Structures are given as C-alpha cells and as structure tokens.
C-alpha cells in the first residue's frame, strides 16, 4: 500500500511540474538605479491586445521592485499591426531613448487563451527581453509558459510568470 501511495505521489508531482516552464538563455544582473522603459509586447496570438495586457502585467511587477520605469504602453494595437516587428521595435527604442531610458523592456506573446473544453484552463506563454539602449544588445532574454486550473484567470497566470521572470534580472 505504501508503494502504491509513493507511486501515485510521484506521478502527480510530475504532472504538476509539467504545468509551467521558465527558460532563461541569457542570465543578467542589471542595476536597479537606472531608468527602464517598458513598451508594448509583440502579439503573435489571435487574442486582441494580448501584447498590451502582458506588457501591463510585467510593468506592474517591475514597478513593485522599486525600479524607475517609463511606460510606453499606449493601449493601441493598431499601430503595431500596420508595421513590421523590426519597425515596431525600432520605434519603441527611439521613443525610450528620447525619454532618457537606459534599458528597454519588451517581449512577445506566443499564447494567451483559454483551452477549449469543459475545464477552459488558461494558457499563457510570453517572453521578456531587456535591451541596452546604448549598445543595442539584448542583455536578458527569457520565456515563460504556464497553464492554470479552470478557476484561474489568464491575468493571474500571466502574473505568476512575470513574478518568476523579473527577479532574474533586477539586482
């Protein structure tokens, strides 16, 4: 009986481990006494304004860390849809530099939806990048993906991902 309990515990533990994933390819410790700008995230999903929603959540988590943060999130996804990703990012960098930021926080949303079916579980996947505006180098790049239970909202799942990603680059 004890062996059966251990086996079931192991299997259920593996199930819960598989529900989220954080990948960090480039670890960085960035100073918290510099000025950061956050722009809208590029939206690869079919969900309208997912890039704006993800950026807004990341903005709140970063602000909680006491970072000086300039918001470039404009609440209008139409501008992003009318240009290429490169033009979108170039424009965000230019605005951030003009406002005196040292770093730009940006990213992409790969998934932002509720699964179909009875449970309707939220599924979120997005990446966060920090770009040094003086050198134009990407100093931090990580992606998080997570699904939640049917009683969680997409916003809660997105916030959980942000809480796991943000401390990885703020001193």
Model-derived segments and spans:
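Bacterial Sec signal peptide processing site at the extreme N-terminus
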Residues: 15-34
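Short, aromatic- and cysteine-enriched interfacial helices/patches
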Residues: 2, 21-23, 170
């Amino acid at each position: 009986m004890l062996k059966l309990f251990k086996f079931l515990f192991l299997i259920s533990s593996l199930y819960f481990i598989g529900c989220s994933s954080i990948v960090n390819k480039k670890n960085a410790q960035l100073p918290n006494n510099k000025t950061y700008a956050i722009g809208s995230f590029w939206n690869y999903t079919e969900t309208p304004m997912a890039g704006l929603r993800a950026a807004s959540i990341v903005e709140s988590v970063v602000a909680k860390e006491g970072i000086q943060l300039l918001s470039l999130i404009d609440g209008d996804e139409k501008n992003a849809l009318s240009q290429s990703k490169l033009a979108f990012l170039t424009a965000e960098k230019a605005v951030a530099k003009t406002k005196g930021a040292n770093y730009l926080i940006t990213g992409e949303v790969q998934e932002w939806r509720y699964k179909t079916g009875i449970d309707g579980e939220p599924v979120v996947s997005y990446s966060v990048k920090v770009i040094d505006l003086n050198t134009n180098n990407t100093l931090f790049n990580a992606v998080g993906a997570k699904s939640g239970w049917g009683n969680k909202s997409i916003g809660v799942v997105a916030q959980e991902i942000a809480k796991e990603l943000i401390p990885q680059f703020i001193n």
